[in-house]
Amino acid sequence: MHVLVIPSWYPASPEDVHGIFFRQQAQAMAGAGLQMGVLAPQMHPLYGPAWRQGLRARRSRPRISQEEGLNVVRVDLPAWLPKARWIDARAAFSQLERAFKAYVRRFGRPDVLHAHSLYPAGFLTYLLAAKYGLPWVLTEHRSLGHMPVRTALGRRAEQQVAASAARRIGVSRGHADFIAQRLGGQWDYVPNLLPPALETLTVSDHSDRPLVVGHLSVLDPVKRPELVIESFAAAQLGADARLVIGGPLTAEIEASLRQCARQAGVEKQLELPGMITDVAGFNQQLDVFVLPSITESFGMVLIEALATGAALVATDTWGANTVISDGDGVVVASADPAELGAAIRQVSTWPRDKAGRERRRESCLSRFALGAFAAKYKEIYAVAAASAHA
């Protein structure tokens, strides 16, 4: 089976981490026995500060590389009217098609196309699949709230795109149901893949160590990092407990978090290490991971923390309800610091020895490791491929 992945965003180079989970998933499926390739379009708007990149994109040629077992073709595309997604995709299609032909000449014709997220990949893959008679799969990772539909024509267009996919996948049950309301059709869900490198981690005994509570995110308002601080303070875990919040720090974000900690009386317990490159190492120090997001389609950070044996506390989101099962942590219906603090205090009393952490880790691996993920997507690809001959 030869699958060509078309993601809506993807690392710009082997060193880039933006969209790295698309690369990790494709590499994992290649390791599971499939031939995997990537066709990565990068849209560049013809307005705003980066308009020159948009102009250059009109003359972009496909760039072919082989990266850690993956055949990759990247192409820059001009975004003429990003809010008119159907028109935009059609305007960029001829350049995408040239990149697709370059891929086929070098690596062969795929059996199935797999688009990640509706725009731009879903729209572009729809056009490619229709022209070349290829079955395709659509996995949506976002809630699409940032992509409102402004016209009846726009709504019909995106529903037409989604309807043509052989299988439609969300990343959690609630997320799949929500996306189905907008795009129509039957949506199944497959949880995201735990990065395979985390499958081989070992857990350690924390029972004799001071308690460490942590949070890791992009630190934007949706993640509510200030609420992590307020909830930690409300938990009243004692002066020895530490709170570590990782993520990219601007001067404004750091000042806001430190002021919040001063007001909550936990300034001396707060650590802000900034951007985290070793996610596993960050999580291995934690006893409790807190994610009080407004919304999470899935929440990769939850399974990454659970894989190291940390207990989880999260607000009621689609992702939290998918990831957190009995014994993994607590889902809190409210964003009230007192209730979140009570949940943090509750899980802080759970066993922190090696056996306790190993139980939580095994709960994660049984549901999100490569074996479960690969089996589900192999079945999805087989159904999609069969639909082309039905």
Where are these regions (language model features)?
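N-terminal subdomain of nucleotide-sugar transferases
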Residues: 1-60, 66, 389
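Glycosyltransferase donor-sugar binding loop
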Residues: 216, 242-256
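A charged, aromatic-enriched C-terminal amphipathic alpha-helix characteristic of glycosyltransferases
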Residues: 352-382
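Short hydrophobic beta-strand element within catalytic cores of glycosyltransferases
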Residues: 311-314
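Aromatic "clamp/platform" in nucleotide-sugar-dependent glycosyltransferases that forms part
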Residues: 275, 294
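Carbohydrate-associated surface elements
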Residues: 174, 193
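Conserved acidic donor-binding segment of nucleotide-sugar-dependent glycosyltransferases
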Residues: 326, 330-337, 346-351
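Conserved donor-binding/catalytic core segment of Leloir-type glycosyltransferases
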Residues: 4, 205-232, 244
